[in-house]
Curated annotation (Swiss-Prot):
Residues 123-171, 188-276 are annotated as: Disordered. The lineage of its organism: Eukaryota, Metazoa, Chordata, Craniata, Vertebrata. GO terms for cellular component: nucleus. Residues 264-274 have a biased composition (Basic residues). The gene is SCAND2P. One of its GO terms (molecular function) is DNA-binding transcription factor activity. Pfam families: SCAN (PF02023). Residues 123-136 have a biased composition (Basic and acidic residues). It is found in: Nucleus. It comes from the Eukaryota. This is Putative SCAN domain-containing protein SCAND2P.
Amino acid sequence: MAVAVDQQIQTPSVQDLQIVKLEEDSHWEQEISLQGNYPGPETSCQSFWHFRYQEASRPREALLQLQKLCCQWLRPEKCTKEQILELLVLEQFPTVLLQEIQIWVRQQHPESGEEAVALVEDLQKEPGRQRLEPRARPSGRTPPAQLRSPWPMTAAGPASRARASETGSTASCAGRWRTCCAAAAAPSAARSASARTGRSTSSCARAARAPSATEGALTRTPAPRRPLQRRRPGTGPWRPGRQRGAGTAPPGTQPRQRPSPRPTPRRPRPRLARPRAGQKPWLLVIRSMERVMYVMLIIQMETEDV
C-alpha cells in the first residue's frame, strides 16, 4: 500500500514536467511557424551571426529575435545535445584554417566535423598543390571579428545594404583622416629630428675640440727647476741669527753677537706627487694620501708631547 501511494504521489509530478516540456516546445513551434516557411539551418545560422541591435526596436525584442534564430539553426526540439555541439564545432572549425582552405571548405557545405576534416586532408594530399598547414596563432583572447561567423550574407535586405554603405563611407573617411594627419605630422617630425641631430652634432664637435681638464692636468709635464743661487756672506738684509755687518768689521775688533733665538722645528709639508709621463693617476692619489697621513701622524705626536 505504501509503494502504491508513493507511485500515485510521484506520477502527477512527472506528468506536470512532461506537460511543461510540451508547452515550451509548442511555444517555440508556434513562433517559428509565424515566420512562414522554414529558412533552413544554413540561412538561420547566417541570420543569427549577422543579427544587429538596430534591427530591433527594444532590447527585449532583440533578445527574442536571437532566441528564434538560434532555435531555427540548432533545432533543439529535434536535435540532441551531441548534434547541437557538433553544429557549433562545425561552425567554428573553418575559422581556424587558412583563408584559402576556409573558403573552399565552406563552399563544400560539410554536414559534420569528420567530413570537414576529410575535405581538408584530401586537399592537402592533392599532387602539385603546395602543402597548406594551419598557421600558429599567438595565445590570448581571440579578436571579436573572429568570433563571428565569416559566412557571407546571400540575401541581404535594404537595411543591411544601407548599413554596409554607411560602414564603407565611414571607413573611407577614417582612412582619409589618418592620411591627412600623417602628412601634416611628417614635416614637424622631420624638423624636430633635424634639430635634435644639429644639437647632438654641435655638442660632439665641442667635446672633440676642447679636451677635458682632468686629462690636461694628468698629461702635463712638470716645468724644469731653476738652480738655487747662494748669497754671499755679509750681503743682503739682516736676519735673526745672523751677525750684523759680518765681513765688514774692522780688524782687531769683534762684533757684538746677539743670542740667536731658539730655532723652531719646521713641520714637514706634504709634498704632493706630480704625475709623470706614463704613470697611472690612481698611483699618484695613493701616494699623496700616504704623505698626508704621515704628516698628520707627526702633528698628533707633537701635540701629545706638549
